[in-house]
C-alpha cells in the first residue's frame, strides 16, 4: 500500500488533506472538493485503477463524497474522500468527463443528497419519479 500512497503523494501532495489507512488493503485520501477531479484522473489513468462506485453521506459538517477505486492487480482499494461544507447549495465538479462510469452514480447522489455535479452531462432523475418535489432529497437529514 505504501507504494500506491507514495505515488499519489508525489503527484498530488499539495492537495492532500489527510491519508488514513483503516483496514488493509484500503486507504482513504481526503482532498478539497476542487481537487477531486485531478485526483480521480490520476488514480484512474496513471495508477490503472477502476472506479468501483461512489457514495455520499449527510454529516453534521457537510455532505461527504467518496469515490472508491480498485487497483485489481494489487488488490488495493483507494477511496478519495471530500467534504462539501455548503449544505444549502452543495456542489462539486463532476468526474464523468474523465470516467464515463461515474455518470449514473453522480446522478444518484445528486438526486438523493442534492449535490450538484458541475459539468455533468445528464443530471436528471434516475431513481425518483420525474415530478419528485424540487429540493427534497431523501437521504438528507433535514428532510426527516
Residue map of PLM features:
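Terminal low-complexity/charged segments
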Residues: 1-144
Amino acid at each position: 500500500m505504501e507504494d500506491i500512497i507514495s505515488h499519489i503523494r508525489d503527484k498530488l501532495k499539495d492537495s492532500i488533506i489527510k491519508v488514513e489507512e483503516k483496514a488493509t488493503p484500503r486507504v482513504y485520501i481526503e482532498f478539497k472538493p476542487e481537487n477531486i477531479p485531478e485526483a480521480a484522473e490520476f488514480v484512474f489513468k496513471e495508477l490503472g485503477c477502476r472506479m468501483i462506485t461512489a457514495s455520499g453521506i449527510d454529516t453534521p459538517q457537510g455532505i461527504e463524497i467518496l469515490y472508491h477505486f480498485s487497483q485489481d492487480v494489487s488488490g488495493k482499494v483507494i477511496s478519495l474522500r471530500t467534504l462539501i461544507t455548503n449544505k444549502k447549495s452543495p456542489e462539486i465538479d463532476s468526474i464523468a468527463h474523465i470516467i464515463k462510469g461515474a455518470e449514473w452514480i453522480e446522478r444518484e447522489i445528486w438526486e438523493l443528497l442534492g449535490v450538484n455535479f458541475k459539468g455533468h452531462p445528464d443530471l436528471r432523475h434516475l431513481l425518483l419519479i420525474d415530478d419528485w418535489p424540487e429540493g427534497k432529497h431523501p437521504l438528507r437529514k433535514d428532510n426527516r
